[in-house]
């Protein structure tokens, strides 16, 4: 009797747990008796993955927090490597968390265990030398975006574009009224969303600029109301204090979380760069991307970052389809000037481009990822 297929997985944070859940579901179609084990969160565990360590043991944010748990994290990494070397899985899949997973993948591959890295690190943007470690550590990289695969192809590193899970989740036709109803917003309200980031340092720098920009827009377009999702109570308190100082009369409604619904409710959005820009594109919301960091971070980033654009919509399109205002260009005057053409217009050209890009990256990523695992197991890439 054949032994069931054994698949090792490591997710390092909540987003990886969601990806792992979808991947396990899709793999069960191919291998209904497969055994899954590794580092998992509640969603992966619910799909039958045995957690040798809980995801929470790795899920830390910030330099100081990582330092505080570094000893524990390194011990976990050593134990998981030793476990998989002693009990080799048929394949190992590291989900995101490259600082942790690439070392695991490298050690396992040295012991002839097949390895896949799911979610490309941003090597195309900065620290491009990491591509050589990735090449040694993995049999295949699974990339969400087409320009990522193009980068790997330049270095002859096996990579497969599988589409983006977020593009699978969001409908091609936006559901604005449904989103507004879920938030208790008026169906016919004119709404500008503001997303100044989720980290304290981001909100500290961008909050005042975004609020002053909104205040100026409010004077020019008095029909508009402003909606903001804040990731937690601390960021909400931070923004409210900034509002009292910079825009006390602004008609502002703050939501606890619910960033997706806020984005989908908006007629336009002002946001910091990051995944939010991709989500706004998929929600078909015209946007301005504005970003500013402290001077030292900017100087270091300018030396390291090797891309023309900072926002994912522009990177996917390989041209500027949304306005980007970074660092010295991130001013109230520039933001207002960039937002004005988006307000009260149908923006059909931008929205049609968003639809085209949505279709490009809407590929049923869970199914594609599972098929990639099957192909590597069968020595096809």
Curated annotation (Swiss-Prot):
It comes from the Bacteria. One of its GO terms (cellular component) is membrane. Pathway: Bacterial outer membrane biogenesis; LPS lipid A biosynthesis. GO terms for molecular function: lipid-A-disaccharide synthase activity; phospholipid binding. Keywords: Glycosyltransferase, Lipid A biosynthesis, Lipid biosynthesis, Lipid metabolism, Transferase. InterPro entries: Glyco_trans_19. Pfam families: LpxB. Its EC number is 2.4.1.182. It catalyses: a lipid X + a UDP-2-N,3-O-bis[(3R)-3-hydroxyacyl]-alpha-D-glucosamine = a lipid A disaccharide + UDP + H(+). The keyword Ion transport does not apply. One of its GO terms (biological process) is lipid A biosynthetic process. Belongs to the LpxB family. Condensation of UDP-2,3-diacylglucosamine and 2,3-diacylglucosamine-1-phosphate to form lipid A disaccharide, a precursor of lipid A, a phosphorylated glycolipid that anchors the lipopolysaccharide to the outer membrane of the cell. This is Lipid-A-disaccharide synthase. It comes from Psychromonas ingrahamii (strain DSM 17664 / CCUG 51855 / 37). The lineage of its organism: Bacteria, Pseudomonadati, Pseudomonadota, Gammaproteobacteria, Alteromonadales.
